[in-house]
Every structure is written in structure tokens, then in C-alpha cells.
Amino acid sequence: MSATLSIVGIVAGDRVYPATRALAGSIVPFLLLGIYVLYVRTDHTRQLWAWEIRSPMSALMLASAYAAGAYYFSRAVFARRWHHIGRGLLPVLAFAALMCAVTIVHWPLFLHDNIAFTLWAALYFTTPVLVAAAWWVNRREDTGRPDEHDVAVPDRVRRISRGIGLVGLVTAGLSLLFPGPLIDAWAWPLTPLTARVLCVIFILFNVYLVALSRDARWSAARVNVESLVVALVLIVVGVVRTRETFIWSGPAAWLFLVGVVAALVVCLGSLWWAGRGRAIRESPTPDETEKVRVIGARSSGIAS
């Protein structure tokens, strides 16, 4: 049976600062524009994007990551408590910082005359600093206390998530540094630039896994898991749209498809499990009350 956590009274602190809300709101329009260009006008990246993306699935992957970000930041604007969104800023920070690095490394390949490149550069040269500042200042608001009738994520599940995330980070990190083997073996054609962007997207998802595994409160994971569902659904649709460009004769295409579908099933299953857990009980047992105290102590230590 799922462990359901409950607290009495109003949680002090755990606020989302106005500056954090403002930052989240200012990022959303950029992401929506990117989704439109990459997911709807996929064949017009030379005219409408920061660089020409010849493989449509590469464009759809980036658009899917942007969709996850747009959902997350939209929720952040209206979040009631900091811990609902706090864990998601670290993956965003990693994504933005690495995109900035990729931009510098492949600077000559970008279409500097396109307005999209100006927006791209403005976004990725400023976002890492702004997101890091928002997380650093706002993190002190996390009291470590769960929501009313919160659900505790089992330790075993969090250990598995952390292990998968760490393995994924090492693999994606090595491919980011040395993209040649990835280009040779991947499910669709890649260039060095699109290969590195793909690695950054994989790093984003795996940092999510590691960051979320550090907190037992489901309320700290829910928005982020929902964001992953948004991205994974769009990726599945993207595979269907661009299936003729996949290299189905190799294992990478099948492994990619199975991995995406499996991740989507796990995310949807976790949302169902947590919803069911919240519905089972509306008052804590003595054991659950003790678990509230333990989770609060652990999460407060991490947040500080």
C-alpha cells in the first residue's frame, strides 16, 4: 500500500519568489516560438531557426524538450510552493549551460543573420546565470515538509531512478565530448552539431532522474514528471511523423523507440500510482507521521 503523508496546519515558508515567477514567465514565449518553428515548420529551419536542421527528428527532439520546458515554466509561474518546482531548475540549468557551450563550439555553423539566432544567443547566454541565481536564492524556502496527504516515493524506486540517471549522464556526457560513435550508430542521420544537441537533451532528462531521486516527496516530483510526459508524447508522435527517415536496419532505432515508450509508460504509471496513493488515505498513521519527520530532515539538509 502506498505511504501517504499528511501534515497539520499551513506550511511556513516554501514560497516561490516573485522574481522566480517572472523569470519563468519570461522564458515561456521563447519556448513556444521554438516549438512552433521546430514542430510545425520543421522543413523551414534554414529560414526560421538559428541553424539549419536537415534531419526532421532532430528538430522534433529539440521541440519536445522545449515543450517540457514550456509546461514546467508555466506551472512555475502559478506554483503554490517552491518545492513543487525547485527540483526542476537544476536540469534546466544543466541544459541551458551546455547549450551555451555547444553554441560556442559550433559558432560558425549558426545562421548569424537570422533573427532566430539572435534570440537563441540571448536565451542561452543569459538563462544559465538567471536560472542559477533563481535556484540559489529561492532554495532556502524549502522547509523539507511534504504537502497535505503527500505520497512518499519508495526508496527502492528512487535508487533505481538515480542509477539509471547516473548511467545515462555518463553515456550522454561521453557522447557530448566525442560525438563520432553516436553519429555512426544513431537511429537517424546526425551532424556533429545535432549530435551534441541531442546529447544535451539526454543529459536534461537524466539530470531530472537524479535530481528527483534526492527527494522522497511526490509533490516535489509531480510537475517534473508531467513535463517529461509532455516531451515523451511529442517524441512518440515525432517518431511516427518521421519514421521514413529512421535507419530501421540498425538496432539504435528500435532501442530508441522501445526506450521512449518504456519511459512514457513509467511516467504515466507513476502519475496513476501517486493519484491512487493520495486517494487511499486522508489521515496519517503514526508510522507515516514519523516518516514526515524523517523526510523533512533529509530534504531540508539537501535544500541547504
Language model feature labels by segment:
Residues 2-88, 103, 117, 181-190, ...:
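An N-terminus-focused feature that recognizes amino-terminal "leader" regions
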Residues 17-36, 143-217:
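Surface-exposed interaction/gating patches
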Residues 39-47, 103-112, 176-184, 239-247:
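Juxtamembrane "helix-exit" motif on the non-cytosolic side of transmembrane helices
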Residues 57-74, 94, 193-213, 230:
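Core segments of alpha-helical transmembrane spans in multipass integral membrane proteins
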Residues 68-144, 238, 248-277:
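Hydrophobic, ordered structural segments
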Residues 91-103, 201-205, 224-240:
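Hydrophobic alpha-helical membrane segments
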Residues 152, 279-303:
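Short, highly charged, low-complexity non-transmembrane loops/tails of multi-pass membrane proteins
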Residues 188, 214-222, 240-256:
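Extracellular/periplasmic helix-loop-helix junctions in multi-pass membrane proteins
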